[in-house]
Each structure stands twice: as C-alpha cells, then as structure tokens.
Amino acid sequence: KKIVCLEGDSAFGFSLAEVETMARYGMDVLIFVINNGGVYHGDSKDSDEWLKLRQNSLEGVKDGLRSTSLGWEVGYEKIAEMCGGKGYLVRTPDELSQATEEGFKATVPVVINVIIEAGQAKKVVSSFGSRPFLVPQHRLMTPH
C-alpha cells in the first residue's frame, strides 16, 4: 500500500532524515513538500532579495531574515535521491501532474518538492493553535 504525506517545508525539515529509514526498509511512500521558504510564509519574492536579507543577517544589520525564514527553494527532493528514492522539483501544475503520476508508479520513497509563492506580501491574520492562515494584503479588511 502506498503511503501519501503532505507537509510544509518547515515540517519536512524535522522529518527529512526519516526518508533514509523509508528507503532502507523499502517503504512505498510519496511525500509532497509544499515549499514557500518559511514557517508561515517566506521573506522574499526572489533569490536576489533573499540573498540580500541573508547577508544582512550575517552582518548583523537590521532588516535581515526573520527567525521563521527557511532557505530559498531548498532542494528537498534531493534527499530522496541520495537515499535511493526518487525526487522531483516542480513549479507548474503540469510538472506537478507529471511528478504525481511518476510518484504513484514508483515503489521507492518519492519526494515531490512543490515550489509555491513565498507569500511575503501576506500576513498571518488568525491562528488556531498552530494553524495560521494567510490572506493577501489587498483582501484584508480594515476597521472603519
């Protein structure tokens, strides 16, 4: 039986070493990593902006990466490849469809790294436990 997992990039950071265990025991697992470059949302709209924020952090300058930032488009799919599984990096619906089809055919651990918008232009407006949701800035209601 195939096991299908859906995790954010932050959650996958805590469990990525288990891909080696899955490969070692021949587990048939398909993992989708929803990658926005941050715990709630990323900090940057592109790699140049992220590198500038990172440099500010390294130099101790104001306006660096937030503590909830993650690396820019980290290649999580490579974890599966390094352990004997398969990995796919996807950015488009067509790539996602193709990788999903291949992932369901495979009998080794598969990681599909789904790059989505970082969401830096959004803000967390509510949180239920650890489940915040994001709303685009133009849709936020302001009190009158």
Residue map of PLM features:
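Thiamine diphosphate
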Residues: 1-144
